[in-house]
UniProtKB/Swiss-Prot annotation:
(2R)-2-phosphoglycerate binds at residues 162, 336, 365-366, 387. PROSITE patterns: ENOLASE. Pfam families: Enolase_C, Enolase_N. This is Enolase.
Length: 422
């Protein structure tokens, strides 16, 4: 039977050495699901609340309160329920929390349980996780968006944009796409070192050189692509995560590295110029999370030429996404499971996007773990795109390696998205 008999929460550490939540769900038939919860650095103001303890322990970042909720109230509520009823379980936890943003029990508590329940149910049915969540139609291997230069709050450098990504749109398989990315990553490392820049990596495994402008970062990446023998725009496209909320000040965008302010119109014009100059096919959070007018202006300007992704704008929240769809803001949504706090709400956001013709991109967080859940989620939803960092750090590679395994499991049914979904 797939009845929940025990739920165990524990405090472990994430990739930044900060506490996070791990949950085990045990079923009556002996099946076990274990999940770890990620954490963001550039968090949107409208995200579900990650419950931290405060005080001096772990500099206030402990998660004992969330663990107590899991081992107490949540276990009491969910014990005896069928793990296959994902929606019912998630709704029960949301009702138990009783707040609009999961602030009482913590989104980190609810998410850990939600994901572990899905894993336990899949295990009990002897199904791969992607197949359990996505059914028989799950077969699209996502095009990876590989963050090989880090800036913003993900790195200790003056670059204002948070991520500079390579996207292997011309590869024929997921495994080949990962090889393309690894070769460019190592070539970039050598070129940076030869130019006198340090090659330490940021939170997501990308390099964090002391560049002062986006153009400088992009030029180094372009040179590395060409040095590897690949064709920019044809085999390798580029993507940006501006994380513009982080440098939005009093109605303008302040570029600290350049010492320059850009008003809303100038910000739109700047991004439009970048996609003319470089083979950039996707821009995430090009405007601040509450600059709705700016988002509409940006979408009207370049939305037919470029994927415009709302991360902080939508925070994996179907209600905010519907507002954006009505307004014509952005044309895609970034999906982060911990922004909303349950698997069923995450899947609802993906479905809402797809029904409206918006793309959905499954994403990691800057504070990650060895858990590879999002790799299975990307295939389960046939989203066709995934962001899971650079080609360094085991917390990032865990997801790439799981995608390689899934591609092998799917065999002839496997279909690499390439540029179809970008």
């Amino acid at each position: 039977m797939t009845i929940i008999v025990d739920i165990i929460g524990r405090e472990v550490l994430d990739s930044r050495g900060n506490p996070t939540v791990e949950v085990e769900v045990h079923l009556e038939n002996g099946a076990l699901g274990r999940a770890l919860v990620p954490s963001g650095a550039s968090t949107g103001a409208h995200e579900a609340v990650e419950l931290r303890d405060g005080g001096t322990r772990y500099q206030g970042k402990g998660v004992k309160k969330a663990i107590a909720a899991i081992n107490g109230e949540i276990l009491e509520e969910l014990g005896g329920r069928d793990a296959r009823n994902q929606i019912g379980i998630d709704q029960a936890m949301i009702a138990l929390d009783g707040t609009p943003n999961k602030a009482r029990l913590g989104a980190n508590a609810l998410l850990g349980v939600s994901l572990a329940v899905a894993k336990a149910a899949a295990e009990s049915l002897s199904l791969p996780l992607y197949r359990y969540i996505g059914g028989t139609q799950a077969h699209i291997l996502p095009t990876p968006m590989m963050n090989i230069i880090n800036g913003g709050v993900h790195a200790d450098n003056p670059i204002d944009f948070q991520e500079f990504m390579i996207i292997p749109v011309g590869a024929s398989t997921l495994k080949e796409a990962i090889r393309y990315g690894a070769e460019i990553f190592h070539t970039l490392k050598k070129r940076l070192k030869d130019a006198g820049y340090n090659t330490n990596v940021g939170d997501e495994g990308g390099f964090a050189p002391q560049f002062k402008s986006a153009e400088q970062a992009i030029d180094f990446i372009m040179e590395s692509i060409i040095a590897c023998g690949y064709k920019p725009g044809e085999q390798i496209a580029l993507g940006l995560d501006c994380a513009a909320t982080e440098f939005y000040k009093n109605g303008s965008y302040f570029y600290e590295g350049e010492g320059k302010y850009r008003d809303v119109g100038e910000q739109v014009d700047y991004l439009a110029q970048l996609i003319k100059t470089y083979p950039i096919i996707t821009i995430e959070d090009g405007m601040a999370e509450d600059d709705w007018e700016g988002w509409k202006l940006l979408t009207d300007s370049i939305g037919k030429k470029c994927q415009l992704v709302g991360d902080d704008l939508f925070v994996t929240n179907s209600a905010r996404l519907r507002d954006g769809i009505k307004m014509g803001a952005a044309n895609s949504i970034l999906i982060k499971v911990n922004q909303i706090g349950t698997l069923s709400e995450t899947l609802d956001a993906v479905e809402t996007a797809h029904k409206a013709g918006y793309r959905a991109i499954i994403s990691h967080r800057s504070g990650e773990t060895e858990d590879s859940f999002i790799a299975d989620l990307a295939v389960a939803t046939n989203c066709g795109q995934i962001k899971t960092g650079s080609l360094a750090r085991s917390d990032r590679l865990a997801k790439y390696n799981q995608l390689i395994r899934i591609e092998e499991m799917l065999g002839l049914q496997a279909c690499y998205a390439g540029n179809w979904y970008c």
